[in-house]
């Protein structure tokens, strides 16, 4: 653990020397009251001037101690452990089989016979007679270190902490927000002004493990003349660690792993994979495209806007988009400064789902359909269940439906030598006033990582065998159309569909490529939709370059309309002195084999913490159109500000934005430029200016608080503060802490601080001899306030004390501290 001395300056050196005299105690080597004899001949100088007696006696004794337990360096929690003396008089920890399992150790592997005992007190080596099996008690930090070979660890519990150490957090409001304002002016014969504003809110009120969550946005369009609030989700949730599940009620979404993701006003109970040891994690797609100017990128899932941001000219990648569920494609729109809009979809399908043997995953949902585009909103139910049968097979099943529709699914996942496979069959029945259809759908998925060639393949294929098959979403729209005589939309029922993704890392120097695609046709529509995307990237020295290509086939009355887009991108790092870096970028785009645009620009940061960023670019487009674009962002201690401006022939665009987080807690309000669902509230009183290495640019505020985002729920998170920037008179008990938060919680991490008025003073005994090295200094109240260092230098942490007493074995003396501190004085 990284620590800062309680007395800054040279006092830290003295204390470091003193602390090194405290030995770690092996549980198999220490006995109570052990006397340690120090050879003071190793200390340079006169031996009678050294007093190591204070470090000569072990304070360890039999009893119960609250100790932090580490297995092979990994924290496993703080436990109350009984320490007792064995027959040989040596100290040992009392273990049980259950305790070792909590520490991530397999008792059966360590010693099958001894593991049957109720309990055992002694050295861990007595469980396994090997030199590399040992336990060491470090008394100075109340820590038990256990070291065992990896073969004796329970790998299922790697990086896992017992739920009893999960932190529910404090009562707090976590309000994340993002605001954008956008204006576009077109100066032509039919010129127009187009303005819009957007405020996105992701708020969570947490207390005692409960979380009241609201996700919504406020949209204002100049043409509409009024603002509209869109509530995407409002729900109350509670983790249930006893069954590794989470329950929620309100505006929720069904799990789209096997059926379509549907919004409900209802309740949901489902397994939370985050509560299990590290394994498969939820998947979120990357969204890639190229903007021709400062553009507004909007991501929709179904009828809901789930993400919106401003992107600068050139290639961009959105990696922080988190869809609901697993099975609904995303629609992305990119609105350029001149008013043009590009719309494309991003395939979003689950890969083959495999579970460990004996592991079960389930999801239960029920409620009223919540979809603003539907008039008919029936009550809907859904349930899915998966179970790991053995190392080869995982079985799964599911059911969903409403009054006029039912669907049943049965499938299996297989872990084979050629990759992860799954196959399932879904039978549906749709029976309403005018519809009576039934059919089947057969689905196969494949996932494989070829380690030899570093090739990753994800393939999801769907085949609808009969014309009467309706998926859940199609059925809802078909019934809504029937009951409301609404013909504004058509239900296209998919017949065959396939999506695939290939990632390939090539040998050194050859870069890598990414390929994805989607193919689909429909029973009630002629032609086939096809969409392919390819990206290749590489480096030549410091020059990064890539080629992106996209081809889209869209059925129309004449057959197929083909749209091609190709872009060539370059980036070269520049250097303008310390803390000032920049990248020279270039992008050239072609549409349908014709030149579309060429853009060149510079972007970078003006400080070492990337708080102040900028971008400048110029673009030449088809028809001799030219524009210039500027954008920048500034991360303050409270929020992140951004702005953009571009102007071209016949138009100009401007935009401003801000984002951040507000945490309201019992003792006040804290602001942060970062956002996140699970956060730490850092408390370090009188430590304004202290930095958080895990969040560049974030510092403790004047009230002694700061926010650290991006904590992993149910996992160990190390929280660190850097004393740099604090007052020299502030002493820290420690600068590193560990916490395991509940999902959506705000956990409080307090660092002990002490305000001190430190002084140094050289003093000698009345006989002229120096004070003994390492002698202890006490104040008038008897409290220890310092230590004697080399050269008879007194390091004192309380300058307000009028008098100090120096004690060592065999003597003591006193010093009046009110006299001149800069001169040598006598200790009488």
From Swiss-Prot:
Alphabetized Pfam families for the sequence: PapC_C (PF13953), PapC_N (PF13954), Usher (PF00577)
InterPro entries named among the record's database cross-references: Fimb_usher (IPR000015), Fimbrial_membr_usher_CS (IPR018030), FimD_plug_dom (IPR042186), PapC-like_C (IPR025949), PapC-like_C_sf (IPR043142), PapC_N (IPR025885), PapC_N_sf (IPR037224)
GO CC, one annotated term: cell outer membrane
Entries under SUPFAM superfamilies matching the protein: FimD N-terminal domain-like (SSF141729)
Signal peptide limits: 1-18
Location within or outside the cell: Cell outer membrane
Entry keyword set: Cell outer membrane, Disulfide bond, Fimbrium biogenesis, Membrane, Signal, Transmembrane, Transmembrane beta strand, Transport
Disulfide bonds: 813-827
GO molecular function, one term: fimbrial usher porin activity
Topological type in the membrane: Multi-pass membrane protein
Location (main, coarse): membrane
GO terms under biological process: pilus assembly
Task of the protein: Involved in the export and assembly of the type 3 fimbrial subunit (MrkA).
Family membership: Belongs to the fimbrial export usher family.
Protein name: Outer membrane usher protein MrkC
Species annotation: Klebsiella pneumoniae
Gene that encodes the chain: mrkC
